[in-house]
């Protein structure tokens, strides 16, 4: 009598039948599949011992069931992406979820480096400065009417230029004769003292501090001999070819102010009418 050779699960004889040997003993094919086979995540059927099995994360699939959920293309030998538990071929994923580069018009592939600004997307290598055409990457940039400029190019193209040195003004500055100047460039033509923040005047478009202008161009007071600049609302009196500060225009004898009063010239001096009538 022959030795028993039965299935470890159903105990039916395996003589003359196909079986599969395991560490637990031999199994007939139906019992093996029912005991050890995984269930396909797509069709919910067992993946038999004679089927090619594919798995992704903790899910198992028949080879024929491992497909793009949109176009049904087999993903067995294709790159794919999982989106919200759905398997998608790269073409379908790009069509549904990827954006188009605003520069070259090509698809920005999943996982590639990109930049987004103002609702638009660029490949990293396509996001260029409109001036120097170098990639902007993570550098600061300035948008202008649909163009994008790195800071140096924007300043070179649009920033105002100093009337003296012709270099761009990136911050601050002063205005003189409706033109922009660097604060350090607006200096007195005479002594080179910075004029920003202080009172100054000009001659033939050249700026001068009050001191230099007075020394170089202003008439001198016939009394105190100091320059009469007329700046800051300062008033003065002129008579013939002589000039006086208001505060200096007084009688040479009694020192009475002659502003708005009659006076009598007496050589290099001026006298009030009283002193003139009194005689020498």
Curated annotation (Swiss-Prot):
Residues 40-92, 101-153, 162-212, 221-275 form the LIM zinc-binding domain. It holds the Pfam family LIM. The modification N6-acetyllysine is found at residues 157, 235. A zinc finger (C4-type) spans 7-31. The keyword Metal-binding applies. PANTHER family: FOUR AND A HALF LIM DOMAINS PROTEIN (PTHR24205), FOUR AND A HALF LIM DOMAINS PROTEIN 3 (PTHR24205:SF5). The lineage of its organism: Eukaryota, Metazoa, Chordata, Craniata, Vertebrata. This is Four and a half LIM domains protein 3. Recruited by SOX15 to FOXK1 promoters where it acts as a transcriptional coactivator of FOXK1. The modification N-acetylserine is found at residue 2. Interacts with SOX15; the interaction recruits FHL3 to FOXK1 promoters where it acts as a transcriptional coactivator of FOXK1. It is found in: Nucleus; Cytoplasm. Keywords: Acetylation, Activator, Cytoplasm, LIM domain, Metal-binding, Nucleus, Repeat, Transcription, Transcription regulation, Zinc, Zinc-finger. GO terms for biological process: actin cytoskeleton organization. Transmembrane segments: none annotated. GO terms for molecular function: actin binding; transcription coregulator activity; zinc ion binding. InterPro entries: LIM_FHL1/2/3/5_N, Znf_LIM. GO terms for cellular component: nucleus; stress fiber; Z disc.
